[in-house]
Amino acid sequence: QYTYDKYEKLEFDLNTIDSGLINSRTFRGMEFIFDQVDTSRITGNTYLPLFINEAFSKVYGDNIINKETEVLEGNKNSGFENNQTFIELIKDLYADFDIYDNHLKFFNVAFTSPLSKTGINVYNYVLLDSAYLGDKWCYNIIYYPRRKNELTFKGDFWVNDSTWAVKEINLQASKSANLNWVREIYIEQEYDVLNDSTFLITKDYMLSDFSFRKKESANGMYGKRTTFYDNYEFDIPKEESFYKENIDPYEFEVYNRPDQFWEERRMEALSKDEKGVYKMLDTLKTVPRFKSLYTIGALIASGYYEFKGFDAGPVFSVLGYNEVEGLRLRLGGRTYFGQNDLWRMEGFGAFGFKDQKFKYGLSGKVLVSKKNRKILFGGYRKDIEQTGASLTNSKDVLGRNRASSGLITVGANDRLTSIELTTLGYQMEPVKNFTFRVLGSHRTLKSASETFSLSYYDQNGDIKSTLKQSELELGINYTPGRKTSGYGVERRVINGGDFPSFFLGYTFGLEDVLQSDFDYHRIQALYTQPWNVGGLGRLYTTIELGRIFGTIPLGLLSPIPGNQTLWSIYNTFTQLDYYEFVSDTYASFHLKHNFGGRLFGRVPWLRELNLRELVGFRAVWGQLSEPNNSINVGIDNLPIRYQSPEDIYWEWSAGVGNIFKILAIEFNYRGNYLNNPGIRKIGVTGSLSFSF
């Protein structure tokens, strides 16, 4: 068992300050902020501190049961009330690491450690010097990468001659590393000797230089993290229950400690420019021009335009198109008094210029108890939607998939459904990252297009075109390793795509409840897992399983999700049309791998482009029982039969990512069922993303 004190300081600075920047129109009326300009000891560039956060914690651990917990005792930050989410995002970027691991993860990419077992394959090492550090004889070894464009470092370290433990180390990312928006990564670590064989970390410093351009003269941002460790104590036992993580650890006092608290616990005094940040930002918030710039930045980041107590948006969903509605105009908004609101309401209105119909929706949620995060939620929506765009149902009352209104599509996008959905549910989190949900819903479904049918034969053999269905759904979701920010009814996930997810759901169709038509049972399971494959990049895998018990029509079955947009949508089958395959029993597998430029980096004329290799594989097996096939009626009021992928449908893709740092293009190839009418053997899709 062990415990120690931890003091952490995060800082963001505007760098490469010159007269052109100071006199630019952007900072007109805000010239006073440049009184705090300083010079970096690492890069030699000038910088202006813009943001600082301090945190003091007690860390407790037990190596026997392999558990550790960090108790935050104080947190202080400059700037705005929404800074906490920003702080948590930055902390995730600067996650703790162990230099002895084979790969060190920064900005969601894995660098090969110079102390890795495989380091000899990617680094050259040179013995430079030897000397006493304290009373320990140490060797000074420099290292540098064997090849360009790989995720590697250069630097040196001092290692003890008897224990081979590192006493000091610095790491500087290779300038040619395939990394976006980052010009520089520099790390220093120092260790002290506890006894003859144990070295404990005492200081960890990391600087990152972010910029849209790699040129040294370009303006950018420094992100700096300085961490001190002190007061190590050992063999102080704690009960295993002590290490249980709190679901909602927020305490008001922790974020409002007096100045005396910080004077007593800071392990390094603030510099003059760091002290000035707190006062400068308080003044900056009163400058009208800065308020305007902040509003524009918030709009780009969140997609919402902020008013007092209300946000309009999201602005990126204002325009859409499908063959039923034609051009679609959507306006929406949400209540928003702060990121930790205990309740929130959302709504929207939409109009299709082709069908001349108005659609709308309203939802609300309230955090009724912070203990175990008990939430009540519900809503109503009347809309046009592309159902069957995913295998695992979400029942998000205001959620609308990208397939419903893609501006550019492939083939006929007319298999749309007119839906009226009402939901009421309860959710709780009895254990951290383990949520339980019970949801009641009622849907009315009918075809929104004359060229698509959801009709079916009822028990009397009559044809019905409208389906009414009440359901009760139980669901559990487990997301180990998920990190969130906030303590209100909504929390922001700050490490999305970095943790596995397990979902298990059971749905009971309630016949005759609110004139519901069918009685049935549905079981669904979903497992997603990201994998860091060392120097070979990053892999994402998904497995979905489902089974329906009972006789139900097309509107309630499980169509295999096609993709007729030109966007790459994960967990869909790009070369399938909507409703090409329908099932009541299914198993699907998705794999997508990003090599991170590992292969292109070895080709001289491609190396400078920093492109990244993408490959994917998708497969699905499914069955459709005879009762669930023969119940359906086509647009001509005659029986219609649907095909299921009993011979495992599959497709694969290969592409290039990081084009202009934001664009990925994938070429998709259909593997079988090549004799189906109107199929697409080959397709091209794209995606936009901001990633390191």
Annotate each PLM feature.
Residues 104-111, 244-692:
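Exposed, low-structure sequence patches enriched in small/polar residues
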Residues 134-142, 166-170, 198-203, 341-344, ...:
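Short, hydrophobic/aromatic-rich segments at coil-to-beta transitions
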